[in-house]
Structure formats: structure tokens, C-alpha cells
Amino acid sequence: MSFEWPWQYNFPPFFTLQPNVDTRQKQLAAWCSLVLSYCRHRKLYTLDVLEAQESPVFNNKKIERKLSVEAIQVVFEELRKKGNLEWLDKNKSRCLIMWRRPEEWGKLIYQWVSKNGMVNSVFTLYELANGDDTEKEEFHGLEDWMLLRSLQALQTDGKAEIITMDDGKGVKFF
């Protein structure tokens, strides 16, 4: 299944941050939406600012336009403000991208657990993210850091408890 680009992606001015405040706000909202949709489609969880400039999301070779590194940082800062991005280093060169926040992943996981009658069951983190039973679920293949944060959100809500097992971490659902 190929990614469907929004109409703005083929509009050259989209690749230059606009000076008008209202226009810029709409433009940044469109960029944020595009980045999250693209990362979701490709199941990307980490991004590098310099590498991002060469990726298709910020570099439209068809119209020969690419977003500057400075503009990418503005888009990333907007994503951070919305809770969809977290910097991995002080230089702000690498980041975690959360196209779905931990609470949202937790809700999806808990719905699956409930739907399949597995409340009061214990799972390893591997079973949840990579097991045969979850193969058709959206959270299948979820990176460990995001899975753990999702389960921590469920633990805060009293729906799960993260436990330490001999071979790593596990979780019990309530």
C-alpha cells in the first residue's frame, strides 16, 4: 500500500515557511499532520534531523523542493509542543516520534486484551509486541520504549502492572 501525499506536497510554497502568522500556523499544522501520517505509514519511531531532510517526507524530488533543516526543526518543535515528539539529545539532532501517544497505544492494547478475554493474564513484552496472537493488531511490532510507556499509562490507570520476570519484563492486566 503506497502512501498518499496531501495536495500541499506538490505545491512549491509549502516547502518555504510562510511569513504571515495565520498562514504559517496552517502550514505547520499541515506539516505536522504529514509527518505523523508518513511515520505511521512507514512505522517510524525515531528520526534524525539531517537524514530527515533527504527523506521523501521533506524532499519532493518531483517538484525539486525540500524543506530546510531550520524549517524541519520548527516543524519538529511544533510536534514536541503537541506531545508527539521527544528529543533524544541536547543538540536536538535525533528524536522519538509518537504518531500515536502512549495513552492511545495503551488503550488499543487494553481493548485487545479485553476483547480476547485475557484480563488477569500475564504477558511478556515480547509476546505483546511480537507474538503470533497480536500479528494482525496495530500495536504488533511496537518498539520496546513505546510499549513500556503505553503499559505505564495503563498501570497509572490501574489496568495493568508491569512486572519483572527472569527473562525481562512482563505485564499483568486487570
From Swiss-Prot:
Keywords annotated in UniProt: Cytoplasm, Protein transport, Transport
Domain of life: Eukaryota
Keyword Cytoplasm on entry: yes
Subunit-structure text: Component of the endosomal sorting complex required for transport II (ESCRT-II), composed of SNF8, VPS36 and 2 copies of VPS25.
SUPFAM superfamilies: Winged helix' DNA-binding domain
One CC-aspect GO term: ESCRT II complex
Keyword Transmembrane helix: no
GO annotation terms (biological process): protein transport to vacuole involved in ubiquitin-dependent protein catabolic process via the multivesicular body sorting pathway
Family assignment from sequence similarity: Belongs to the VPS25 family.
Taxon lineage: Eukaryota, Metazoa, Chordata, Craniata, Vertebrata
InterPro entries in UniProt: ESCRT-II_cplx_Vps25-sub, ESCRT-II_cplx_Vps25-sub_N, WH-like_DNA-bd_sf, WH_DNA-bd_sf
The protein's name: Vacuolar protein-sorting-associated protein 25
One GO MF term attached to the UniProt entry: protein homodimerization activity
Disulfide bond annotation, renumbered to this chain: none
Major localization class: cytoplasm
Record's function text: Component of the ESCRT-II complex (endosomal sorting complex required for transport II), which is required for multivesicular body (MVB) formation and sorting of endosomal cargo proteins into MVBs. The MVB pathway mediates delivery of transmembrane proteins into the lumen of the lysosome for degradation. The ESCRT-II complex is probably involved in the recruitment of the ESCRT-III complex.
Matching Pfam families: ESCRT-II (PF05871)
Gene: vps25
Cited PANTHER family: VACUOLAR PROTEIN SORTING-ASSOCIATED PROTEIN VPS25 (PTHR13149), VACUOLAR PROTEIN-SORTING-ASSOCIATED PROTEIN 25 (PTHR13149:SF0)
Location within or outside the cell: Cytoplasm
